[in-house]
Every structure is written in C-alpha cells, then in structure tokens.
A protein has these predicted regions:
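Signature of N-terminal electron-transfer/Fe-S-associated modules in redox systems
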Residues: 1-150
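Active-site loops and adjacent core secondary-structure elements that bind or stabilize anionic groups
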Residues: 153
Length: 153
C-alpha cells in the first residue's frame, strides 16, 4: 500500500491504495463517486472519462499513484448537487443527448474538454473524430453531435 494525495472535485484527498489501483477504482470504490462508469475496462468505451488537470482522461487506464498532486474532476464535481446544471449537462438534456445514461458522464466530460480546447473551431468532422473514443449504443451520436453547436460553444 502507498499513499496518494490529490484533489478530487475541489477537495483534498489522501488515500492508501495498492500500487495496481486504477483511478476509476479510487473514485468508485474508495471515494464512492460512482458517476464515473466502467464499461469495458480496456480504454475502448469512454464511460470512465474524467478530467485530470483539465484534460479528458480514461480513468480505467491510469494508476491512482500516477496522479500525486493532480486535480481530478469527475461528473459529480462538474456542477453543485443543489445548484444549476453545468452548461454542457444542460445542453445534453435540452438536445436529448442521452437515453440510458451509461455513457453520459464520459461523454459530458469529453465534451467539456473538447469545447475548452477547440471552442468555436468545432465542426461536425472534428466533433465526430474527437468522440471516437466514446461509445454510445443508444443515441446514434446525432443529437450528441448537434449539442456541440448549441449554446455551449
């Protein structure tokens, strides 16, 4: 066991973890932040995406110990539980960008990162290329792609 200290959703966290503990396991099992989903455990589906130091990262591929001092934002930290939705969450809701919801946390955090990086330079091709690492079996991506061109960008 080894200690790792990082910031998760704005709160300082120190946890004793096994050297093989993945970030997704730290979030879900140690911190009980279950909004980050595990779909494939092989970096294929994107359901486990969180923001690490502001960048989208598949949390099933990163060891918790690698994140010493990092700033991690999971879907639970994107907007206050008792406050308004984040603009990207609102865009998903308004544009029907979800059905079963399993991929939604990863899709939303990927979208937040993409809009931060590309902003008004987004076009349909770029959006589709950037979403290749996020699998949704329900929506067919059409509404998800449309929401990028809504009021979020």
């Amino acid at each position: 066991m080894a200690a790792v200290s990082l910031t998760v959703n704005g709160k300082s966290v120190t946890a004793d973890v096994d050297s093989r503990t993945l970030l997704v396991q730290l979030l879900r099992e140690h911190l009980r932040l279950t909004g980050t989903h595990v779909g494939c455990d092989t970096s294929q589906c994107g359901a486990c995406v969180v923001l690490v130091n502001g960048k989208a990262v598949k949390s099933c591929t990163v060891l918790a110990l690698q994140l010493e001092g990092a700033d991690v934002l999971s879907i639970e930290g994107l907007a206050p539980a008792d406050g308004p939705l984040h603009p990207m969450q609102e865009a998903f809701r308004e544009n029907h960008g979800l059905q079963c919801g399993y991929c939604t946390p990863g899709m939303i955090l990927t979208a937040v990162d993409l809009v931060r990086r590309k902003g008004h330079e987004l076009d349909d091709r770029t959006i589709r290329e950037e979403l290749e690492g996020n699998i949704c079996r329900c929506t067919g991506y059409h509404n998800i792609c449309l929401l990028y061109t809504s009021r979020c960008v």
